[in-house]
Amino acid sequence: DTTPFNLEKDIQKLVEGNTEEFFSLEFVSSEFSLNEFRIDTLCFDEENKSFVIIEYKKGKSYSVIDQGYSYLSLMLNNKSDFILEYNECKKNNLKRGDVDWSSSKVIFISPSFNTYQKNSVNFQDVPFELWEIKKYSNNMISLNQHQSSSKESIQNLEGDKSSIIKDVGKEVRVVSEDELFVGK
């Protein structure tokens, strides 16, 4: 039997306390505010040398594409603020050249996603991940990633792509599993 999370904050608290165990990510900060945006959780991927933004959702009435590209654009246009946040929170000395901005991504975590949300990230190269989280009556937790089934690139969309997608697409590159395991 699954038991619902009462608040989005409950999901956030659980994940932030376990970013290393769940995603092999180093927790940096919670509720990072920059300009008019507030990022739920900021993490750093030590293996890929990149920042990862985690957003939590309890409802199904939001666009992951709009929010994801807005946050990646915010990051890429304010790199020094992200490095400063890391250095101040981790008491470290990360430099701009130490970060692979092209590997940055946004993870969305929710008890469920609707069909439109799942289809919106159904491209091989969008830097977004959807993870469904469930809590069971025996206090067990499950996290399941929605896997893209498409080989289509978002870069192949015809017509006017929004400038934010173009700008982020120039800097962020999603690596395939085949590329990831070459040379390892």
Where are these regions (language model features)?
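Charged, terminal alpha-helix-loop-beta segments
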Residues: 1-184
